[in-house]
Structure formats: structure tokens, C-alpha cells
From Swiss-Prot:
Chain residues that bind [4Fe-4S] cluster: C265, C268, C300, E307
Co-factor requirement: [4Fe-4S] cluster
Protein name in the entry: 4-hydroxy-3-methylbut-2-en-1-yl diphosphate synthase (flavodoxin)
Family: Belongs to the IspG family.
Species: Lawsonia intracellularis (strain PHE/MN1-00)
Keyword 4Fe-4S on entry: yes
Pfam families referenced in this protein's UniProt entry, alphabetically: GcpE
Length: 359
């Protein structure tokens, strides 16, 4: 792991981004923003699973008008995703939205950009410049022969300069491609070229499995190199599925922890319990738990306690029985497979309570 690059600190609402702030988990609603009730429901669902900032699409004036009601009831800071019509950005800022995601170059003539920047200053809002490989300007595609990393970086730097020329520095930048390798290359170049906080993502990553793999590889490499201040896992799924993936990437790299880490063996012919079901049941019981414990679910009593000796608590199954252990030592035996989950969760809850009283 490389030391994380110290970028310029900005704020989205009360959330610090960059500098010495932790890496922040974001997502984006996929509801019709004009449907206030549905959008707030999804924002609350995202909040419940650990999302810290939410972006909303603002495609038209009616969506922009809905933002105030959404903002006023939202438990999280919000970013309005704006393209082409600068008036939507102004309405969003007047609604209290904490941040914008725009490309200054597609807002229109310079005076429109200046109007948006002045409004962002007045409302103490930040602006994310979001460059995607599919939206690189034609002259840069012609110059570089395609939407290659060099073209994306030059596009981002050009957009940054537009804001800097207006003395605006509350900037965050993203530079995404559907290609993992291009995404990595682009962020590496951009990180060397500016000190603004970077929002990481692989765009159009795909469905749950494919998108998780692509994002984990791409973002994991960048984060391990000290690059990145916020991240979003883009999945063709309910956005609630994105957030746990982001947290697991951060956990795997030792950057942040949220909730229990559940480790489980892959199962083999020695397993004498339904290990897959037991693991899923334990995960379901702890889905909303925030205590950062390590919990092991192992398939057999031969190797289970030893293999999971670093776990705070764990269970190893045998023929119609299970052994519960803590830090590798047996603390309780359970007879009857139908009792394993309930008894194990009793012990887990004791450990959680003990942990929380010592913090």
C-alpha cells in the first residue's frame, strides 16, 4: 500500500472530501427525481447501508423543482447531476443542494458558466467535473485518435481551468471509462497533474458480478496506490447493492471498516452442515450491524477454530453439532443443527455488547 496522496480538502455539506478526510462512499439514485416519495425512499435505503453522499439526475425543470422537498427531508448531502441547461444548476443550488456534477464545457457560453460558478460560491456548494470516455470532446478525440486516457485527462484539465479562471476551487474531479485499464491509466495521470480530490469509478461497469469485479480491480489498484478520495461502484442493479461493495473494497485494503467482517470457508466434502445457508443467515442477521467485528463461519470442527483464530467469534460445524469459538478457543458447543444459528447469534450479540461498552 502506498501512502494516500494528500489532496485539497473541500466540503459537500458537512462531509469533508480530500485532505486528511476518510475516503467517502457515494451512490446515485435511479428513481425518477420528479417522484419525491420514491426518491426519498431510495435515499433512506442508501443511508441505511452506509452511503454517505447521494447524486440525483436532474434532466428537466420538473426534476429540479422537486429537489427542495427531497433535500429538506434527506439524511445525506446531495449532488445534482446537470447537463446542458445551466438553469437547472441554479434551481438545484437555490434548493439547498450541496454539490453539482457538471462539465463546464457543455453548459454553454462562458457567461452561463460564470452564473453557475457565482451561484455555487454564494451557496457554498462544490462542483464535480465528471469526464467519461463517452463524452470526450470531438477535437480531443481527433487529436488523440480516440477517447484514450490522455484525451480524458486533457478534457478534465481544460474544464478545471474554466472554473479556476473564475477563482473557483471547490472542485472534485472524476475521469471514468468502461475499460478498467484506461480508467487506471487516466486517474494515474490526473493525480500527477492536479491536487483536487478525485472521485473514483468505472463507468458502465455492468451487472452485479461483472460490475463488482471490474470496479474492485480498477478501484482497488488505484486506492492501493494512494489515489482517490471518494468512490462509487456503478452497477446495473438497485443502487443499494453498490454501497456494500464499496465498503468491502475499503475494508479489504485496510482503509475503512463498517460493520462486521464475515469470513467463511469455501466449503468442501468435510462440511457436515449446510454452510452456505448458515453463512447467509448470519449475514442477514447482521446486515444493519455497525460494530466492526471479525466473525467466522467455518464448515468443520477439524480446521475451523485454527483457520479462524483471529476472529472475534466464530462457529465451526460438525455432524449435527457446532462449536463456537472466540480468538481460536472453544467457548461453547451446540447440539442440533436447527439450533446453530440462534445459539451462535446469542454469543455474537454478547461480543457486540461487550465491544460497545469498551469503546
Amino acid at each position: 500500500m502506498n501512502i494516500r496522496k494528500k489532496t485539497r480538502k473541500i466540503y459537500i455539506g458537512n462531509i469533508a472530501i480530500g485532505g486528511d478526510a476518510p475516503i467517502i462512499v457515494q451512490s446515485m439514485t435511479n428513481t425518477d427525481t420528479r417522484d419525491i416519495e420514491a426518491t426519498l425512499k431510495q435515499i433512506n435505503q442508501l443511508h441505511a447501508v452506509g452511503c454517505e453522499i447521494v447524486r440525483l439526475a436532474v434532466p428537466d425543470a420538473n426534476a429540479a423543482k422537486a429537489l427542495k422537498a427531497i433535500h429538506d427531508a434527506s439524511p445525506l448531502p446531495l449532488i445534482a447531476d446537470i447537463h446542458f441547461d445551466y438553469r437547472l444548476a441554479l434551481t438545484a443550488l437555490e434548493s439547498g443542494i450541496e454539490g453539482l456534477r457538471i462539465n463546464p464545457g457543455n453548459i454553454g457560453e462562458r457567461k452561463k458558466v460564470v452564473t453557475v460558478v457565482d451561484a455555487a460560491k454564494a451557496h457554498k456548494a462544490s462542483i464535480r467535473i465528471g469526464v467519461n470516455s463517452g463524452s470526450v470532446e470531438k477535437h480531443l478525440i481527433d487529436k488523440f485518435g480516440g477517447p484514450v486516457p490522455e484525451a480524458m485527462v486533457e478534457s478534465a484539465l481544460n474544464h478545471i481551468k474554466i472554473l479556476e479562471d473564475e477563482k473557483f476551487y471547490e472542485i472534485k474531479v472524476s475521469i471514468k471509462s468502461s475499460s478498467v485499464l484506461d480508467t487506471i491509466a487516466a486517474y494515474r495521470m490526473l493525480s500527477k497533474s492536479c491536487d483536487y480530490p478525485l472521485h473514483l469509478g468505472v463507468t458502465e461497469a455492468g451487472s452485479l458480478i461483472r460490475g463488482t469485479v471490474k470496479s474492485s480491480v480498477g478501484l482497488g489498484i488505484l486506492l492501493s496506490e494512494g489515489i482517490g478520495d471518494t468512490l462509487r461502484i456503478s452497477l446495473t442493479e438497485d443502487p443499494v447493492e453498490e454501497v456494500p461493495v464499496a465498503w468491502e473494497i475499503l475494508r479489504a485494503l485496510g482503509l475503512r471498516r463498517r460493520g462486521p467482517e464475515i469470513i467463511a470457508c469455501p466449503s468442501c466434502g468435510r462440511a457436515e452442515i449446510d454452510l452456505i445457508r448458515l453463512t447467509k443467515d448470519v449475514e442477514a442477521c447482521l446486515v444493519n450491524e455497525k460494530t466492526p467485528l471479525k466473525i467466522a463461519v467455518m464448515g468443520c470442527v477439524v480446521n475451523g477454530p485454527g483457520e479462524a483464530k483471529e476472529a472475534d467469534i466464530g462457529i465451526a460445524g460438525g455432524r449435527d453439532k457446532g462449536i463456537i469459538f472466540a480468538k481460536g478457543k472453544v467457548i461453547r458447543s451446540v447440539h442440533g443443527q436447527d439450533k446453530l444459528l440462534n445459539v451462535f447469534m446469542e454469543e455474537v450479540n454478547k461480543v457486540i455488547a461487550e465491544y460497545n461498552t469498551t469503546q
